[in-house]
Amino acid sequence: MHYQLRRRGTKMTELRGRLRAAGDRLRALPTHPGVGEARGFGEYLIQRIQQDQCAKSAGMLAYVTLLAIVPLMTIGFSVLAAFPVFEGVTDRLREAMVDYLVPAASDAIDEHLENFMGRAAELTAVGIAGLTVTALLLLNTIERVLNEIWRVERPRPTLQRFMVYWTVLTMGPLLLGVSVASTSYMGTVNLGPLEPPSDLIAQLLNLAPFVVQAIVFSLIYSLVPHRSVPVLHAVIGGVVASGLFELAKGGFAAFIARAPTYEVVYGALAALPIFLVWLYISWLVILIGAEVTQALRGYRWRTGGDLARNRWALVLAVHILGHLYQAQRRGAGVTFAELLEQEPDAGEPALAEALETLRRHHVIERSADGAWLLARDTSTFTLAELHRMLAYPLPPAAGLETGAPWDRRLAERLRRVEERWEQSFDLSLSDLLEPTAEEAGAGRSARAEVA
């Protein structure tokens, strides 16, 4: 028995050794540059998802959504009710939204929402104001989380944010109502000889949810963050999020159907935890899509170029102070994201380290809205002081002559330093190591005194 166990353990050890050797051989194989780039992008994306705590943010958004969904739908359907053309559309719109967004327990959720909205319609002006504040709280939380993903230090001004929120609360329901009304109308129109084949119609209808989701997610990623997001990046992120959302809907519905744990434990209240879990999954998918959108640009900035090297720390510091100096003359500050856009060759880590070093030495500081400002009088702050606080070697003058005006002036000073350095260090090692006549005489005198 013991022999068999030892033999089995030996075989497992051999198997692990072979697997480890096979993995080493695979890693040693030359890979296509695209494969390595894709792997690096995936690692960067996972790192950002962990750093931004997307799972935690999704949980927070799920709870806020649970509180705000009734106020949002109440305000939205109140807007639709103000237009006679949408009469009779609100019920179909609510049912369609619940069926579309909640893959399980949709009937129970729809019943609860209808009851809650009916009661909300009977509230006084104070109650309606409270519902509006709750809805605005959700929109503000969404904007804050997305701004954190894009490293936005300075949010929109209060008035501008209120206008954006109010536009979403009023125009969003109108667009949804127009969509549902148009779909219902097109379903009753006889297209005659131009009617496409039924198979094609079925395929288009099956594809419609994916396309609509991708458009909505793309608009969220491009409009909500207080940052300039390339349209192509937002579209790619929207498509990824839409695909993940469809997979999540199918998987969640299958899980609830085959493992009715919530119904067994909670009974009639099972719809609430099911809905809460689904809200969490939905927000996690949305945040992952946002991370993909951000990573399409951020991955290029992750390491930077020459300015990310310690040898060029002085040049990077001068660039940072130059941008802050120009902004100060306009009476403004510069955010981290704006600096990164102006100095993409620096990369996020090196730029963050340089800013922290300058802040630690009280050369710069951050304002209440997150912008960086100069904290020292530039007329009394010398280049020598800046170099001493960086604790890195001087960069070469070559390569700076064609840069910004401050680069050319810095290159001139560096050339003078290099010339004097050459003169000071124009000494052979023999001359350096050989004692001088004075040192030799002092040594003989010391030996004579000892004797």
Swiss-Prot record:
Q: Where in the cell is it found?
A: Cell inner membrane
Q: What Pfam families does the database record attribute to this sequence? A: Virul_fac_BrkB (PF03631)
GO CC annotations on file: plasma membrane
Superkingdom as given in the UniProt entry: Bacteria
Its membrane topology: Multi-pass membrane protein
Where is it chiefly localized? membrane
What the entry lists under InterPro entries is as follows:
UPF0761_bac, Virul_fac_BrkB, WH-like_DNA-bd_sf
Which ranges does the record mark as transmembrane?
66-86, 122-142, 162-182, 204-224, 228-248, 268-288
Note whether Chaperone occurs among the keywords.
no
What keywords sit in the KW lines? Cell inner membrane, Cell membrane, Membrane, Transmembrane, Transmembrane helix
The UniProt family comment states:
Belongs to the UPF0761 family.
> Could you tell me what this protein is called?
UPF0761 membrane protein Hhal_0704
Q: Organism source for this protein?
A: Halorhodospira halophila (strain DSM 244 / SL1)
Q: What is the lineage of its organism?
A: Bacteria, Pseudomonadati, Pseudomonadota, Gammaproteobacteria, Chromatiales
